[in-house]
């Protein structure tokens, strides 16, 4: 644990570290996995889920090659789309409320590709995207969503095989746009926080093994796909697991620098998506 004077300095310089420490100290009211349902609310029936807001954290629900059940996996435990859900989403939303002036709904919104409802949400987050599969209609709807102003952030897939499977799905959606490696000076890293040197953000395996990578994903890849005008439409977080960092931010065993980096990146990506 950092000495208090060092913690105070980090809070003054970054702001975000204070949020991570608040998570770990319990001042956000987060007690651990499953605590969001301690009041008897299900995923989407809490009173706050009906509040009108200017921003909705939207998580993409998709069919996947590893679903335990048919279709979208429902709201049970099936479906790769729901990794870290909903705790990661809601802890990130608490940080968004604390650190920005965005009026965000405190609960997440699940969006599907089998309806046009996705067009109501300008920013969408997806995980475990090595496992996603699309019908032709779903791929076209996501294609249209991105080219009409939508922003997609993908996270939590690792290594060469995962990359190839992710790109197989992505090429159904955006077949003709190149994937680019982000540079330090790219605008998306300087919208809210100036993020210079970046490092690999590990998942929960770090707590148990000290290992930052999964599979053969040794080097973090910060990549994007842009539209014809240069706007980023897909932000790709490969060989890292930001969602786990958000989910584990309240656990003192998970190092603060990893959680702080994950929050800063997510906040910059949201601010970019909302302003471009």
PLM region spans:
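Surface-exposed patches in mature extracellular/periplasmic domains of secreted proteins
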Residues: 102-112, 154-159, 177-185
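An acidic, glycine-rich "communication" segment
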Residues: 27, 32, 37, 65-71, ...
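Aromatic-Pro/Gly-enriched surface loop or interdomain linker
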Residues: 21-123, 129-130, 241-244, 248-276
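Bacterial N-terminal signal peptides
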Residues: 8-19
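Positively charged n-region of N-terminal signal peptides that target proteins for export
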Residues: 1-6
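Short alpha-beta junction capping motif
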Residues: 57, 118, 123-163
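Extracytoplasmic/secreted envelope proteins and their assembly/folding machinery
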Residues: 89-93, 139, 143, 163-167, ...
